[in-house]
Structure formats: C-alpha cells, structure tokens
C-alpha cells in the first residue's frame, strides 16, 4: 500500500508524510502523474493559497489526473478548497469536483481571522460519531454546509469541517497537527473510505 502526497507547493508535506507513516503505510511526496495514478491513496495537502496550489497542479498537468482518480483522495485545508468550484481567495477557479464555493470568514472582536488553533468538530453520520473531537485549524476561508458535508464546526458561522463525495474526502482541519484525533481521522480515511 502506498500513499502519494501530491507536492503542490505546500509547506506541510513532511508533517503529512510523518502522520501517514505512523499508520505503517509508505508515503511518497511526488508530482509524478504515474505515481499519483498508481498509488493506493492520494493526499492533497494544503498550506498557502488556492491560486498557488491550482497553478502548481496545472503546471504539472495533474488536474485531470486527480479528477479522474478512483482510489480514496484526501484534501487537507486548501487541498479541500480546491475540490470545490471556486475560492474567494484571489477569485480562484478550482477543480469542480464538489459543487460550491469557498468563502472568507468575517473578522470581529470575538472571532479572529485566520482561525488558528483547536476547534470542536461534530461528525454527522452515526458511523463516524466516534470521530467527534477537537481538531487543529489554520484557515481564513471555509465552505458553507452542503449535502456532502460529513462534519461541522463553528467559527463565527457554522461551516464544513469535513466533506465527502464518492472517493473524495476533504477536511478543513489539519489531521497531521491534530494529535490522537487526527490519527483516528486518517485511520478512517485508510480503512473506511
């Protein structure tokens, strides 16, 4: 079993790789189309901007490859954002795998933007209720709650903390920074998706 961690210009590649390897699964950081296509699992990590990630994927001709994958795919933070139609961040057109747009949080005295730190996540399906926990977030943008939302959190407004459409799973939080809760979430990705 191999996990392809797509190198799309993010900064959290090594921490995602270490989080995967805790599960005794080989993880390779790559932007090679064949390695991505042939991996058992694919992870789109994300730190940076949606526009930079999309440009990086486009320059490597990976967008259509990713959209055509049938194995489980996990998008983390911006990796989740790019699964949607658009992001308000630099008005970026994304991969259009999941219908909807990514919006920016409004800042006020009680809710700082970006959201940095631990937040309670509630999973919506009975088979994932054991994943309810606090997870680590670092985000200024969010997706509204839609039909494919499988977990929610709140930061000035309720928002999608995790989403699933077919073999594509996305999480707004960072499982690689979320300690035991993050390990359980990755276990769900590797064993239940």
Where are these regions (language model features)?
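Pocket-forming structural segment of enzyme catalytic cores
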Residues: 85-157
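C-terminal and late-domain segments of enzyme folds
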Residues: 142-193
């Amino acid at each position: 079993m191999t996990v392809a961690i797509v190198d799309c210009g993010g900064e959290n590649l090594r921490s995602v790789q270490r989080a995967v390897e805790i599960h005794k699964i080989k993880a390779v950081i790559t932007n090679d189309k064949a390695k991505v296509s042939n991996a058992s699992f694919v992870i789109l990590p994300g730190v940076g901007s949606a526009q930079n990630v999309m440009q990086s994927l486009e320059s490597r001709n990976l967008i259509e490859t990713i959209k055509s994958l049938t194995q489980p795919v996990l998008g983390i933070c911006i990796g989740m954002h790019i699964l949607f139609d658009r992001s308000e961040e630099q008005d970026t057109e994304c991969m259009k795998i999941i219908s909807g747009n990514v919006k920016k949080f409004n800042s006020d005295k009680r809710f700082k933007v970006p959201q940095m730190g631990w937040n309670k996540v509630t999973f919506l399906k009975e088979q994932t209720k054991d994943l309810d926990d606090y997870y680590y977030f670092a985000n200024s943008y969010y997706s509204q709650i839609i039909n494919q939302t499988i977990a929610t959190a709140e930061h000035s407004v309720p928002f999608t903390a995790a989403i699933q459409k077919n073999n594509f799973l996305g999480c707004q939080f960072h499982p690689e920074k979320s300690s035991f809760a993050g390990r359980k979430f990755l276990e769900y990705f590797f064993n239940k998706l």
